[in-house]
């Protein structure tokens, strides 16, 4: 077994108990990672539900619609999602935000478990391990699909649900019995 490099070790100068919890105080904390999300780079994509309907942001409300490629191109500011990837101090999936840009940037939020696009740029840094803006993009085993779990509401995923005569993007607790409403196809687009 190979020995660990000293560069990957942390030297401690002190240990202390506070409220029955043992804390280690490092000599230097400059190399320690904090619990946060740091924005890295972005890509653009079109998201489709299991019925091949395109995610369309209409007045900051996300809905799924049947669209031809020509319709999609004509509606590009509302169908072209900007997916920012974030560095995550924990391993829970690819941390991302989902945004669209028409005249202004809007970013998807799941505040209070309500899905909407808020007029804002995705933040450079989020000093927490949970956020209403961060979703964990994960590959669905056995499918060529993705799912997006909320970092704020563990076990809750973006999903497509029919309401009245529209298909809407919602946040819901995932049904463990092969729930296809949380599965999406991402088609990456060329950066312009």
From Swiss-Prot:
Q: Which InterPro entries match?
A: IL-18 (IPR015529), IL-1_fam (IPR000975), IL1/FGF (IPR008996)
Coiled-coil residues = none
Swiss-Prot/TrEMBL site (Cleavage) positions: 35-36, 69-70
Q: Which UniProt keywords apply?
A: Cytokine, Cytoplasm, Inflammatory response, Secreted
Q: Cite the GO molecular-function annotations of the record.
A: cytokine activity; interleukin-18 receptor binding; receptor ligand activity
Q: What's the superkingdom here?
A: Eukaryota
Q: How is it modified after translation?
A: The pro-IL-18 precursor is processed by CASP1 to yield its mature, active form. The pro-IL-18 precursor is however not processed by Casp4/Casp11 in rodents. The pro-IL-18 precursor features autoinhibitory interactions between the propeptide and the post-cleavage-site region, preventing recognition by the IL18R1 receptor. Processing by CASP1 induces conformational changes to generate critical receptor-binding sites. The mature form is then secreted and released in the extracellular milieu by passing through the gasdermin-D (GSDMD) pore. In contrast, cleavage by CASP3 inactivates IL18.
Indicate the principal place this protein occupies in or around the cell.
cytoplasm
Which Pfam families does UniProt cross-reference here? Answer: IL1
GO BP terms, alphabetized: angiogenesis; cell population proliferation; cholesterol homeostasis; defense response to Gram-positive bacterium; establishment of skin barrier; extrinsic apoptotic signaling pathway via death domain receptors; immune response; inflammatory response
Q: What is this protein called?
A: Interleukin-18
Q: Which organism is it from?
A: Mus musculus (Mouse)
């Amino acid at each position: 077994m190979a020995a660990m490099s000293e560069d990957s070790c942390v030297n401690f100068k002190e240990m202390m108990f506070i409220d029955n919890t043992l804390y280690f105080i490092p000599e230097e904390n400059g190399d320690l990672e904090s619990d946060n999300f740091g924005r890295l780079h972005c890509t653009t994509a079109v998201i489709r539900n299991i019925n091949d309907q395109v995610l369309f942001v209409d007045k900051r409300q996300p809905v799924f619609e049947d669209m031809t490629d020509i319709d999609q191109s004509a509606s590009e500011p509302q169908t072209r999602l900007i997916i920012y990837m974030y560095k995550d101090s924990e391993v829970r999936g690819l941390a991302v935000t989902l945004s669209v840009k028409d005249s202004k940037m809007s970013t998807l939020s799941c505040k209070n478990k309500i899905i909407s696009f808020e007029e804002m740029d995705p933040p450079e840094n989020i000093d927490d391990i949970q956020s209403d803006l961060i979703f964990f993009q994960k590959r669905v085993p056995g499918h060529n699909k993705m799912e997006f779990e909320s970092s704020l509401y563990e076990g809750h995923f973006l999903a497509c649900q029919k309401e009245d005569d529209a298909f809407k993007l919602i946040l819901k607790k995932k049904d463990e019995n092969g729930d296809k409403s949380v599965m999406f196809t991402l088609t990456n687009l060329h950066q312009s």
